[in-house]
């Protein structure tokens, strides 16, 4: 695996990890849907994993941390845990990638470095999946409630910017992890060992006929 491909994979994975952090912190998983009579409103509501915010028409914004975890919808409760685990996995994957990087001397053996890099790629792939699942789950819930006639219009929401950031984070980590998983051990380690057999050499004198005799034959 070339160093350029390794750097590209690690850079994409790190960028995806940063986007995951933004997705986790941004309180815009759900935003007010401007439909029906609510098209003219004096405030906009944002809902995130950790807090909700109300933006007034004057530009003033007030945010409040959720008082209870049980007050959150089921998809946001699961998203909290999965997104945090995804961030921690990506951190661990980054540390493993640095250990197995070709530009570091933590490990001297090239074969071991390649295997460590593959492990880092798998960790980033898992982090991408753990980011993709809650983001897609939340988007599905928002769309389902939006078209549900039993849900009041005042309670309907639209997808916020955090969901799009989460999808981008998942895509970047998937691509970066896939590039790191392309790291293979050097082919020299798989080359078959060739065994060369040579005829035994005689220590006795060689006659004119080319046959070697031991000296005891002349006694």
Curated annotation (Swiss-Prot):
A GO term from the CC aspect: plasma membrane
Location of the region described as Interactions with TJP1, TJP2 and TJP3 in the Swiss-Prot/TrEMBL record: 218-219
MF annotations from Gene Ontology: cell-cell adhesion mediator activity; identical protein binding; structural molecule activity
Side Cytoplasmic, residues: 1-8, 102-115, 181-219
Protein's membrane topology: Multi-pass membrane protein
Alphabetized UniProt keyword annotations: Cell junction, Cell membrane, Membrane, Phosphoprotein, Tight junction, Transmembrane, Transmembrane helix
Alphabetized Pfam families for the sequence: PMP22_Claudin (PF00822)
Record localization: Cell junction, Tight junction; Cell membrane
Name used for this protein in its record: Claudin-3
Oligomer status and interactors: Can form homo- and heteropolymers with other CLDN. Homopolymers interact with CLDN1 and CLDN2 homopolymers. Interacts in cis (within the same plasma membrane) with CLDN19. Directly interacts with TJP1/ZO-1, TJP2/ZO-2 and TJP3/ZO-3.
Major localisation: other
Originating organism: Bos taurus (Bovine)
Family label: Belongs to the claudin family.
Membrane-crossing segments per the record: 9-29, 81-101, 116-136, 160-180
Function: Plays a major role in tight junction-specific obliteration of the intercellular space, through calcium-independent cell-adhesion activity.
Domain of life according to the entry: Eukaryota
Residues carrying Phosphoserine: 198, 208
Keyword Phosphoprotein assigned: yes
GO BP terms: actin cytoskeleton organization; bicellular tight junction assembly; calcium-independent cell-cell adhesion via plasma membrane cell-adhesion molecules; cell adhesion; cell-cell junction maintenance; epithelial cell morphogenesis; establishment of endothelial blood-brain barrier; negative regulation of cell migration
Gene that encodes the chain: CLDN3
Phosphotyrosine, modified sites: 197
Extracellular side: 30-80, 137-159
